[in-house]
Amino acid sequence: LKKVERKYEEVIETYGDMYEAEICKERQLPDYNDGMRIVQRRLFWVFLSMSREKRIHLQKSASIIGDTLKLHSHGDATAYGSLVAEVNAVASLLKGKGNWGSKTSSVACRAAAMRYTECAMRPSAEDYFRYAQHSDMVTGEIGYPEPAFIPVPFPYALMNGFFGITKSGKCQIPSYNIHDLYERLLFLLGQKPEKIIKPYFGMTLKMDGEFQNLLTQGIGKVE
């Protein structure tokens, strides 16, 4: 092997940037295909791998997390934290039973331990994931098969929004009304006239025309 001498700063910068780019792509930011972070996709896939009769009935959260860890080996706290976030999402596809915490009270209330809570898929999730069986499967990091992405009508992040900070910037995706997203989808399929949809959370708009340019051309300014 040839010895290569490099400055410590160069090594940190080069490999640090490579690591950050990989983390952003694989874990921190939603995938553009289905709008899900990898832990979200793995959680939903655990439900979708069950029979319909089982997934629409309440399951112990500890059991769900146990199955998720077969795909997502980054600790039960991370997986359960994501499950709590999905149950409490604005347009949640999961329903919960037990203490799932509260963000509305003046005092922060954390969710109960996973052994005390239960959750199941909402009926609306059956429609959203209707094409899940057509997912392209890949071998996950532990060796189990998992979907590269799940075919969905529109990216999940557009329903519930997303905010994340990375080493070199931040990602902020506003939330849209589900009905408006389906209206936009029908327009893109040529089934309905164009309707400019507006986010209802996560963004402040200066002018309607400015947002129309942002939506149709990708050019505009938001706060």
What annotation goes with each model-predicted range?
Residues 1-216:
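Catalytic phosphate-handling regions of large nucleic-acid enzymes and associated NTPases
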Residues 218-223:
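Charged, surface-exposed alpha-helical interface/stalk elements
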